[in-house]
C-alpha cells in the first residue's frame, strides 16, 4: 500500500476563468486546479477526484464556482491525489 507523505488543504481561487470565453470556463477551471496543485505540491502527476469534477461542472460550462476547497495528498510514489474538502 502506498503511504501518504504530505496532506494539505487549499482554497483554490478560480477568478482567472472569467477571462476566457463562457463556453470554455469549466474546462479552464479544471486546468487551473491541476496547475495550482502541481505548483504548490511540487509534482507533475496530479490526479483529481470525481467529486472535484462534479463540483466544477455542477452549474454547466459557463458558470464554474469562484473558488474550490480541496484536500491534496502527496503519496510516496510521487503523485498527488486531490479530493473535494468536506465543508
Swiss-Prot record:
Query: What protein am I looking at?
Result: Large ribosomal subunit protein eL31
> Keywords assigned by UniProt?
Ribonucleoprotein, Ribosomal protein
List the PROSITE patterns: RIBOSOMAL_L31E
The record, for Gene3D superfamilies, names: 3.10.440.10
Looking up SUPFAM superfamilies in the UniProt record yields: Ribosomal protein L31e
InterPro entries, sorted: Ribosomal_eL31, Ribosomal_eL31_CS, Ribosomal_eL31_dom_sf
Which range is the signal sequence, renumbered to this chain? none
Amino acid at each position: 500500500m502506498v503511504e501518504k507523505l504530505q496532506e494539505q488543504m487549499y482554497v483554490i481561487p478560480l477568478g482567472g476563468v472569467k477571462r476566457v470565453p463562457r463556453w470554455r470556463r469549466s474546462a479552464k477551471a479544471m486546468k487551473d486546479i491541476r496547475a495550482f496543485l502541481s505548483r504548490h505540491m511540487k509534482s507533475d502527476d496530479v490526479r483529481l477526484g470525481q467529486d472535484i469534477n462534479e463540483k466544477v461542472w455542477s452549474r454547466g460550462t459557463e458558470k464554474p464556482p469562484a473558488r474550490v476547497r480541496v484536500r491534496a495528498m502527496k503519496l510516496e510514489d510521487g503523485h498527488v491525489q486531490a479530493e473535494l474538502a468536506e465543508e
